[in-house]
Amino acid sequence: MTNPVSRREFLNLLGAYGGTSAVLQAGVALGFMPSSSQAAEITLQANNGKKVAILGTGISALTTAWELTKAGYGCTLLEASHRPGGRMFTVRSGTVIDEIGNYQRCEWDNDPHLYFNAGAARIPSIHSNVLKYCKELEVELQVFVNESKTAWVQDDAMNGGKPVRNTDYSSSMQGFISEMLSKALGDSQLDSSLTESESEILLSMLRRFGDLNEDMLYKGSTRAGYGSGGFLDHGTKKDVVALRDLLKARNGGSVMVTTQEGTGSGPLLMQPVGGMDRIIYAFANRLRDRIKFRAPVTEVMVKDDGVEVAYEQNGVTEVLKADYCFNCIPSHLMSGIPNNFPTDYSEALNYIRRGRAYKAAFQAKERFWEKENIYGGITWVNAPIQQIWYPPHNIHGKKGVVLAAYNFGGANYTEMSQEDRIEDLLKHGEKVHPNYREMAEKPMTIAWHRMNHMLGCAPRWARDRGGWSDKEEQMYETLRQPVNGRHYLIGDQSTQHSAWMESAIQSAHYALADLDQRVRSEPA
């Protein structure tokens, strides 16, 4: 008899082969996870006189405060920083990047179109709770172009280091893969698994998918555009980059699937007009009287009948007493703040690691990418900068802000001076755009693992790339339960799909539902 596979093991295996998109879709289909296809309806018991302390002003904290305030709870939010939002952070003229050892103030032109989303930057259409709050709070949205086939793929080892258009790369890879699979249909093992009719159907699909010729060979495709002509004159196909050369691009897998699949991907996503922090300030402006800024928490004590939170503001230590506490302080920071949490809870808090994402951006003197027929999307570079993003808004304007680096594990940038960081992004960027260095004005960089009050970005639970261990699963479940029924940990750190606003919001909804059940069960 075979050993049964647990839910977690099943999702781990699925994730190893299909990525987070497959995990979430299967989890929803099998009832392991809530569907995000519909936004949650939050109904809380109203006007019960309860007081709630909310630690931090990330999107989970603001969601919590908004829903509780609408229900008549008394809420106080404590924020260590001078601004709300945590990792939902937009840089524009005058913005301070409070990175330890690399303080920067943005000096870009004071223009509403010139901004850089240094943290969260994209909203998929299936992130229904994010979209629900945008609608409720009247945050205007616009299209975010996640993929442009006219953007570039560059690797020093491919094509002599010369960049290749995304469309050339992806069309050719589709063609070569289709050609190889069509040849494999003659293999006895594969052929035996298909009927003659099924083989014919598959061959027809492969011919169309890869744009193969009558001999089922890939000889180039007009899908990649024409080398010349195509409108008034007959078009001629572009020269084909050989498969062996294409395979030298070590970021090819990202080019082929990152903007096509996944809960955070797709060619077309959304963003708020004017920057991602428009969502944050839509909440914060409505909760302004309840937020205390520059008020770092110094102690959290859970009592039988409530929670006491000590914090400092203006050099004075204050104590906030509340019936309940919702806490989105990053776990690795919270573990260093004096508290009386149970041992297993503290162990779980201290276990979660943090990502080290790095981003950089500059104001461009001209929208030079538009002269290359690029309007949004991502260029992939096999270098530490990894990605270049082009702004999809303010098309044909004078200037724009280019995201010049996005490295998910940017610890190597910590050791660099600001000058060296800038030189690194320029030298790799000019391999794609020869006038890159000339066009770049006033670059800004941000290493999230050095940001004050954050010291990291998205939480990382699993130590093993193959999935979660039983111990990690147990620690995760421990943090999802409120300490003494009074203290709730919220944010993407208490979800299985970190780094997304939708996850953080759903964590708040989960905790709010638990709170409401407890409040309703209390004796009158």
Task: Label each region the model flagged.
Residues M1-S21:
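N-terminal secretory signal peptides and thylakoid transit peptides that target proteins
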Residues L13, A22, G31, A71, ...:
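Conserved flavin/dinucleotide-binding core of flavoenzymes
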Residues I42-M180:
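N-terminal glycine-rich phosphate/pyrophosphate-binding loop and immediately adjacent elements
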Residues I59, G85, C134, F283, ...:
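Generic structural signal for small/hydrophobic residues in well-ordered secondary structure
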Residues H113-P124, S265-V273, Y345-R353, F408-E419, ...:
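Active-site rim elements
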Residues T150, A157, L181-P296, D304-G306, ...:
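Active-site/ligand-binding neighborhood in enzyme catalytic cores
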Residues N327-D344:
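Flavin (primarily FAD) binding-site architecture
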Residues S346-E372:
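Central beta-strand plus flanking loop segment that forms part of the substrate or channel wall
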